[in-house]
């Protein structure tokens, strides 16, 4: 069964109120070789006020949010849905995706009147690399290098753990770059 690795960049952290600003995905074969990829940026909905912190983290200029050449939210979500259906059935997987990206994706499908549970229906299954990293560190503690953050705690953030394990991470918090780092960590 192929894999669909994906990531979103969003207008904030509130899954019920914020929106996807960028969605990227890579379909791989069983050996994690890239078969196809998809990347779309999304125009900001008129009623969504983006978090300044999210814009700083994602390095999105406010001007880009209203760029009329970008697809509308509805158009982009339709493109995402069509691509996921085209690639199905597959294992849909991200990094820290079950509790965040997955919820935003479901909310976006719901808001655009599409079935919300695409990632675990239509023959699809879902997973998350972050719990796999936790399990690897717990059961094989010398397998991965885990960086220590400024508070002296282990950091499992993708933008920190991937480089600590040899990944040349350029452009963290850009959805396609994060997808490639997730595949590396898988």
Feature map (PLM): residue ranges:
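Metal-dependent phosphoesterase core characteristic of DEDDh/y 3'-5' exonuclease domains
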Residues: 18-23, 27-60, 83-186
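Short acidic, Gly/Ser-rich segments with clustered Asp/Glu that frequently serve as metal-coordination loops
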Residues: 9-16
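N-terminal phosphate-binding or glycine-rich loops at protein starts, especially the Walker A/P-loop
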Residues: 6-9, 25
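Metal-dependent phosphoesterase signature
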Residues: 58-77
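Extreme N-terminal starter segment of soluble prokaryotic enzymes
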Residues: 1-4
């Amino acid at each position: 069964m192929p894999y669909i690795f994906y990531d979103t960049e969003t207008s904030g952290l509130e899954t019920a109120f914020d929106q996807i600003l960028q969605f990227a995905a890579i379909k791989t074969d069983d050996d994690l070789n890239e078969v196809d990829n998809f990347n779309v940026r999304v125009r900001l909905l008129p009623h969504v006020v983006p978090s300044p912190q999210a814009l700083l983290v994602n390095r999105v200029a406010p001007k880009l949010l209203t760029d009329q050449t970008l697809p509308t939210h509805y158009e982009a979500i339709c493109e995402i849905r069509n691509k996921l259906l085209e690639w199905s059935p597959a294992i849909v997987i991200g990094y820290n995706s079950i509790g965040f990206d997955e919820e935003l994706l479901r909310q976006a499908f719901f808001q655009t009147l599409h079935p919300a549970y695409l990632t675990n229906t239509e023959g699809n299954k879902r997973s998350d690399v972050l719990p796999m990293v936790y399990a690897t560190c717990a059961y094989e503690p010398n397998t991965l290098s885990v960086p220590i953050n400024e508070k002296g705690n282990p950091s499992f953030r993708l933008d920190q753990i991937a480089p600590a394990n040899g990944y040349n991470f350029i452009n963290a918090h850009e959805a396609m770059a994060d997808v490639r780092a997730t595949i590396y960590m898988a």
